Regions:
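Mid/C-terminal beta-alpha module of Rossmann-like enzyme folds, strongest
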Residues: 215-277, 291, 311-312, 320, ...
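NAD(P)-dependent short-chain dehydrogenase/reductase
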Residues: 151-207
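N-terminal Rossmann NAD(P)H-binding glycine-rich loop of SDR-like oxidoreductase domains
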Residues: 1-22
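Active-site Tyr-X1-5-Lys
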Residues: 134-161
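Glycine-rich NAD(P)-binding loop of the Rossmann-fold in SDR/ketoreductase-type enzymes
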Residues: 81-92, 139-140, 210
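NAD(P)H-binding glycine-rich loop region in Rossmannoid oxidoreductase-like domains
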Residues: 38, 48-88, 96, 116
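Alpha-helical substrate-binding/gating segment
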Residues: 186-238
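Conserved Rossmann-fold NAD(P)-dependent oxidoreductase catalytic core, especially the SDR/UDP-sugar
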Residues: 92-137
Length: 350
């Protein structure tokens, strides 16, 4: 079996490659990323290509499955650049899958694709995927879900799987996630237990997470199995302010959502940090997901708990952990994080 993976050098992509490499049914893997990494894995060959611009049909020819992970979080101050890769690039991937006659497509959707929903009960995959209007990320995830709806109608012979995970963490993603969401001004020591005196106990601030290795196992099962459709991917427990405070050895302090959003908005507009306020809206609005279908139809079961994945991420952020790929490499930040400052904090991708 030959598998092509776009966005293969990031947090999720590297774990997906490792999971596919271990599967005897997979003979060869083509990893596609904007920049060729130093990482070497058995069965894996690399091609440097941008899904928003490169000719993809030739790269997909002969593949038994394409796993589409490529996605931009930054530059958050360049909306058109995000849309060009996230929506335009996805459309080009789907078109190339059809033209190359690839029989299976596995797409990395997200909890962010869902319309606002409940936090006191879990919803299944039938919940509407209208996204969160104020979130760039959610807008694009919802738009790509619509593209995929059209693709499935026009290409019924292609087996399509959509995975909708919560937040995905691992040790090696520590530096990447710190760069993407906290920026160069936040010291690593701030992620140590006891460093923060309090965490915001904001109403509806409850989220789900999964370890990258467990998410990767879901992708592997989707590739080598016969299932199709959408699948929620998340581990237990749901992370709420009380649990988050316990993990950080901090006190939960009630903070209104409006104050949290205002802080994010002002600091983002001043380019003090790279996360726009839409991420706060997304965190407060998206529903809690029921992952029973993935367990039932994919045979997926997470090995690690959500809080264990979060603690591993915090360790990676504290230690500056990474891996030998451009998105994960701590050295990419440069001395004193100079390369991050040169992006104007959300002005362009690193």
């Amino acid at each position: 079996m030959r598998v092509v993976v776009t966005g293969a050098t990031g947090n999720v992509g590297t774990s997906v490659l490792e999971s596919l490499v271990r599967d005897e049914a997979v003979d060869s893997i083509l990893g596609i990323a904007r920049r060729r990494p130093a990482l070497s894995l058995p069965k894996v060959e690399w091609v440097a290509a941008d899904v928003a611009q490169a000719s993809l049909v030739e790269l997909f020819e002969g593949a038994d499955a394409v796993v589409h992970l490529a996605w931009l979080i930054q530059p958050s101050h360049d909306r058109e650049a995000l849309r060009a890769t996230n929506v335009g690039g996805s459309a080009r991937v789907f078109d190339a899958v059809a033209r190359a006659h690839v029989p299976a497509l596995v797409y990395a959707s997200s909890v962010g694709a869902y319309s606002p929903g409940p936090k006191d009960r879990a919803v299944d995959e039938s919940w509407p995927t209208g996204g969160i209007p104020s979130s760039f990320y959610a807008q694009d995830k919802a738009a790509v879900e619509s593209l995929l709806d059209e693709f499935e109608v026009s290409r019924p012979s292609v087996r399509v799987v959509r995975l909708r995970p919560g937040l995905i963490f691992k040790l090696e993603s520590g530096t990447e996630i710190r760069r993407l969401f906290a920026g160069p001004l936040v010291p690593r020591a701030l992620f140590s237990r006891g460093a923060l005196p309090f965490v915001p106990a904001t109403r509806r601030l409850r989220f789900q997470a999964v370890h990258a290795e467990d998410a990767a196992e879901a992708y592997r099962l989707a590739v080598v199995g016969s299932a199709s459709g959408a699948f929620n991917i998340a581990a237990q427990p749901v992370i709420d302010p009380k649990l988050f405070a316990q993990i950080l050895d901090a006190r939960p302090i009630r903070v209104p959502a409006s104050a949290l959003r205002a802080l994010a908005s002002v600091s983002w507009r001043l380019r003090l940090q790279p996360t726009p306020p839409g991420w706060i809206d997304l965190a407060l609005a998206v529903p809690i997901m029921d992952a029973a279908k993935a367990r039932r139809e994919l045979g997926w079961s997470p090995r690690l708990r959500a809080d264990e994945a979060l603690m591993e991420l915090l360790e990676g952020m504290r230690n500056g952990s990474g891996a030998p790929t451009p998105p994960l490499d701590p050295a990419a930040s440069g001395p004193l994080r100079a390369a991050e400052f040169r992006t104007r904090i959300g002005g362009r991708a690193l």
